[in-house]
Structure formats: structure tokens, C-alpha cells
């Protein structure tokens, strides 16, 4: 549905190798863009030169995605770093030549990874709040949740419910896309790293142009979860410290809920990276 929306706003984007170009169009922009986000950058240059793109919603071939944590997380890191670099340092001169609706579509792409940064900041905020003994905001927690949950549930219903009508393969794709949700949670640490390195202009070397897709479900991916383990330890320490200060202290009562969420979510997802879980998953899927 997002790509169809882009098409309707005259902003169909280039998608990696799944695109066809006019030779004249590429010559007009000086060739295919050289950048880690080369597809988005190329599309941006083409629209700035008033070329038009078309999205064809037909499945011509089925590809693969990484089937285990490591390549998935490194892919998120590489993609986010390149998108941040593109939109922070390079995109503005081209965006100024576009129509407002095209600018909106490209900014939707550019701002997407800030959702991951937001999740990462919300993960560390309760930890910091406990040690400085200050609530992150002045509000009544349960009153806030009673209002926020309504909006959050409505958002999920739109995403999971209404989104089912846009599937290209309904029999295979219908359902709750929980894996992508877990990937966003786990990948938030790597997206934040990609953001910081983009700000420091530390560009990535394209050592691997194609992310490995082979199934290594029985191989431990624990190495990629070291940041999550450290965040879990910090959350446990903050939880214990909040009780040590005063178990009834109002500033830390609500924060403990979020610390417990950190602990269970981060440790739970870390368990999925272990070798025995990979073997169990393969046995169950086989």
C-alpha cells in the first residue's frame, strides 16, 4: 500500500535491482547514483530532473530475506546509516526541486528510521530516570496510559486489520507480522548506531553487496545481542536500585513497569539468538 501511495503521488521509488531505467534518463542525471542508498538517491535525482517513475504491482519473481538475526541486524544498520546520511547531508538540493506531495513521500522514507531511534530512547529513558531520581515527564502514568492505549490499539487495528487487503499473496502473507515487529525492537540499537555514525560522517564500506540468505538457524547469534544484554543488565540494576532508594517513592513506581518491560522483552529476544533456540525453531518448522 505504501508503494501504491507513492505511485499515486508521482513518487514511485527505485527498489534496488528490481527496476528498469531509460538510458536517456540515467544519462541526464550523470548515471546511477553512487551511494549506499543508491536506489533512493537515484530516484531523488530523477524526480529532480522531472522524470516520472511507475510502480508495477505485479510479482515477477520471489526473493529471499535473511533467515537469522546477524545479517538482518547488519542490514538494518547499513540501510539506516545510508538513509540518514542521504537525507541529512545530500538530499536537500534535490528535494527543493520537487512538488510538495513528492517531498512528503520522500520525507516519509527519510523519517521512518526515527521510529527505531524513538524506541531506543524510550528503552534507556527509564534507566536514566531512576539514577537521577527524576521522572521523565510530569504526569499521572495510569491516566496517560488509559488515553494512549486507545490510540495504540487503533493504530494496530489499522495496520494489521486494514492492511490485510493490500497483500499480494493473501494465503501466505495474511496474519500478524510479529517477526517484523521483533526485528524493529532488536534493530533499534543498530539503527541508533547507524544514526550516530552518519552524524559523524563515518561512511560504511560495502564489503558485502548481497546480504547472505542461507539458513543458519542452529548457529548462535548471541554476539549480535551484546548491546541488548547490557541494556538488560542496566535495567535490572536500575530496578533494584529503585527499590533500594524507597519502594514507595512515587517517582519510580511507574518507571518500574517500563524497566520490567525492558527486562522481559530484551532478555526474551536475546534467548531467540541462542543455538538451542535455533535448533528448536528449525525442528518445529520442519
Residue spans for each PLM region:
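Membrane-embedded helix bundles of polyisoprenyl
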Residues: 18-20, 60-63
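Membrane-helix boundary/interface segments in integral membrane proteins
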Residues: 201-220
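Transmembrane beta-barrel architecture of outer-membrane proteins
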Residues: 38-40
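Catalytic donor-sugar/metal-binding loop of nucleotide-sugar-dependent glycosyltransferases
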Residues: 34, 43-62
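Membrane-embedded multi-pass helical conduit in multi-pass membrane proteins
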Residues: 112-204, 222-286
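Short, hydrophobic alpha-helical packing/hinge segments within bilobed ligand-binding/sensory domains
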Residues: 42-43, 72
